[in-house]
Amino acid sequence: MLGRSRLTFVLLAAAVTCAEAQHAPPWTEDCRKSTYPPSGPTYRGPVPWYTINLDLPPYKRWHELMVDKGPMLKIIVNSFKNMVNTFVPSGKVMQMVDQKLPDLLGQFSGPYEEEMKGIADVTEIPLGEIISFNIFYELFTMCTSIITEDKKGHLLHVRNMDFGIFLGWNINNNTWVITEELKPLTVNLDFQRNSKTVFKATSFAGYVGMLTGFKPGQFSLTLNERFSMNGGYLGLLEWILGKKDASWIGFITRSVLENATSYEEAKNILAKTKLLAPAYFILGGNQSGEGCVITRERKDSLDIYELDPKQGRWYVVQTNYDRWKNPLFLDDRRTPAQTCLKRTTQENLSFATLYDILSTKPVLNKLTVFTALMDVTKNHYEAYLRDCPDPCVGW
């Protein structure tokens, strides 16, 4: 009990610190400039590229990647296990994950179950732990996504991927444990069929869903978590109890990237498909006005907020809060992003200026794993690993 009390105290102290830091230098700063091309202390390095051959049987598609990344996946899976065992020292939870979870969850749709089995066999990690690693992203993703349209009608779609809140804090170097362990697992993926690109994405090795990607010439898509009382935990419980009529959000995102052929088709699927967890889908197209944030409950859409440059709406910004509500006072990334966009102006939109915005604290924070930049029309896709050196807010 003492260990849990100390953990609670640390989390409360972190929350108070972040609440104070959200609106005070040096944890916030004026809009950054000249950070692109990426360099300096906020740049960890490039994200490596791998090809996923969709012509291969699902079981074999990830083998080459996982031979490279398997050792790093074992590190993060062991960190998850250690955190669980801290709360349940008997080890029974992880025993259930290893022995019971695959049967509890039953079959997954499409190729995903066979892909996870292949990953488990190559890495020699129990299938239950690979499944739990994939489930994890349904519950703990915090991000900032932006779509912009310039005066010529050209669209850009960018995002910071923030992940790992409350999942272990390293007091020696002031970093989130899981966030840091995800960086070596971050990969750019070129999904190909008949040796031609179907879509590109940035993801984590071992995860078969998608959170960030684009279909060249057609549309771009990012997924942000949406917190709700009717949330992912309830959807997961329903799935375990046998109600399997909803889609995993990472899987539906991948399915849309792989199979949808237009912005409108993608928007229709994302707006209407029943989901296991609430979410924000940030979708960009290839022509003027094609950009929106789809705010989803599990069963239906609450709101579709679209670009409307004729009415002065030349950007959309989505973090992890409904646009009609104020962000949580200790986690306001929306206001700094909007402020920097307005200062940038519609005339000066580019990968460089948008990377500057995503490099400005607290949009950039201790949870930020990578920054992705997407230009659908020009088939230009970039992703970079990030750091946020002290002083930097925890989220």
From Swiss-Prot:
Cellular location(s): Lysosome; Secreted
Keywords on record: Disulfide bond, Glycoprotein, Hydrolase, Lipid metabolism, Lysosome, Secreted, Signal, Sphingolipid metabolism, Zymogen
GO CC, any one term: lysosome
InterPro entries given in the database record: Acid_ceramidase-like, Acid_ceramidase_N, CBAH/NAAA_C
Positions of the record's site feature: Important for catalytic activity: 162, 320, 333
Chief localization: other
Reactions this protein catalyses: an N-acylsphing-4-enine + H2O = sphing-4-enine + a fatty acid; N-dodecanoylsphing-4-enine + H2O = dodecanoate + sphing-4-enine; N-tetradecanoylsphing-4-enine + H2O = tetradecanoate + sphing-4-enine; N-hexadecanoylsphing-4-enine + H2O = sphing-4-enine + hexadecanoate
PTM section of the record: N-glycosylated.
Glycosylated residues (UniProt): 173, 259, 286, 348
GO molecular function: fatty acid amide hydrolase activity; N-acylsphingosine amidohydrolase activity
Active site positions, chain numbering: 143
Pathway participation: Lipid metabolism; sphingolipid metabolism
Disulphide bond pairs: 31-340, 388-392
Signal sequence region: 1-21
EC code(s) of this entry: 3.5.1.23
Pfam families assigned: CBAH, NAAA-beta
A biological process from GO: fatty acid metabolic process
Main function: Lysosomal ceramidase that hydrolyzes sphingolipid ceramides into sphingosine and free fatty acids at acidic pH. Ceramides, sphingosine, and its phosphorylated form sphingosine-1-phosphate are bioactive lipids that mediate cellular signaling pathways regulating several biological processes including cell proliferation, apoptosis and differentiation. Has a higher catalytic efficiency towards C12-ceramides versus other ceramides. Also catalyzes the reverse reaction allowing the synthesis of ceramides from fatty acids and sphingosine.
Record text on subunit structure and interactions: Heterodimer; disulfide-linked. The heterodimer is composed of the disulfide-linked alpha and beta chains produced by autocatalytic cleavage of the precursor.
PANTHER family associated with the record: ACID AMIDASE, ACID CERAMIDASE
Family per similarity comment: Belongs to the acid ceramidase family.
Protein name as annotated: Acid ceramidase
